[in-house]
Amino acid sequence: MISIFSKLKQSLSKTSNKISEGIDKIFYKKKLDAGTLEELEELLISSDMSVLVVTNIIEEFKKVKFDKEIDSDTVKEALAKLIEQQLSKSAIPFTLSENKLNVILVCGVNGAGKTTTIGKLASMYSAQGKKVAVAACDTFRAAAVNQLSTWADRANALLITGEESADPASVAYRGMEESIKQNIDILFIDTAGRLHNKKNLMDELSKIVKVIKKLDENAPTHSVLVIDAITGQNTYNQVEHFNDATNLTGLIVTKLDGSAKAGVIVGVVQKFNLPLYFIGIGEKIEDLKIFNQHDFARNLVGL
């Protein structure tokens, strides 16, 4: 059976191989000087980390006391610690309240793995003995409702749907009403995912938030954005737009197993000061893992 650490290492291989091999090449029989530091900086930027994050890492890297003879493994160890520091803002866990309804608003663009992620989370919490409900608020896409229905059956979760093309906010409201009535522990609200630069979608999300607050002024408990790791630099735009509409509390990153742009996670966490709750490293339910910044940082540099 593959361990979590090994599965993460395997998932990050497209990014980590590039960084690891780059470091090996830069520091092969070379000293740490202005030239090698510049090469290292370019390598990290090419992995889709932001310029600001890389600049911070390089400045801290210069302060590390190395022996005269420096090798690539020593560099990787130092880098892993510095990347972990940059990810310190991601360390806030995904917490739920006991004895009350937790409302989780889940948003993201089409194709990011939003509905699948909800299904995995629903299955995970159902297996822990929680009563789970799912509100299908992507009412303009029949396929999304069907997909969510399959996941809800698998997770033994209550499914709340509306008529095709119904107002998504009305479905969210009814989802909360039913969840309160049936003493549900966790309600996941699946939302539409049309392109993030479409004003109508952002208005729709804002309306959902406004409507559910009528039943609970503290709702949603969490507003989570699901990001496809393959997206790369466009991730920054997505986070900014969805954050404006829903006041995000955290992130979930999917498809790390298919991405060569995993470095973008470091920049996004640092820029927006948002925790990264879960990462998707495969298609199975158990492949949605709680994010561990220590393991991620070490695997990212090939350790």
Swiss-Prot record:
Protein localization: Cell inner membrane; Cytoplasm
A Pfam family recorded for this sequence: SRP54
Membrane topology per record: Peripheral membrane protein
Gene Ontology CC: cytoplasm; plasma membrane
Annotated GO biological process: SRP-dependent cotranslational protein targeting to membrane
GO molecular function: ATP hydrolysis activity; GTP binding; GTPase activity; signal recognition particle binding
Record key words, sorted: Cell inner membrane, Cell membrane, Cytoplasm, GTP-binding, Hydrolase, Membrane, Nucleotide-binding, Receptor
PROSITE patterns to which the protein is assigned, alphabetical: SRP54
Gene3D superfamilies hit by this protein: P-loop containing nucleotide triphosphate hydrolases, Signal recognition particle SRP54, nucleotide-binding domain
Matches recorded under PANTHER family: SIGNAL RECOGNITION PARTICLE RECEPTOR SUBUNIT ALPHA
Family label: Belongs to the GTP-binding SRP family. FtsY subfamily.
Subunit: Part of the signal recognition particle protein translocation system, which is composed of SRP and FtsY. SRP is a ribonucleoprotein composed of Ffh and a 4.5S RNA molecule.
Role, per record: Involved in targeting and insertion of nascent membrane proteins into the cytoplasmic membrane. Acts as a receptor for the complex formed by the signal recognition particle (SRP) and the ribosome-nascent chain (RNC). Interaction with SRP-RNC leads to the transfer of the RNC complex to the Sec translocase for insertion into the membrane, the hydrolysis of GTP by both Ffh and FtsY, and the dissociation of the SRP-FtsY complex into the individual components.
Protein name: Signal recognition particle receptor FtsY
Organism: Rickettsia conorii (strain ATCC VR-613 / Malish 7)
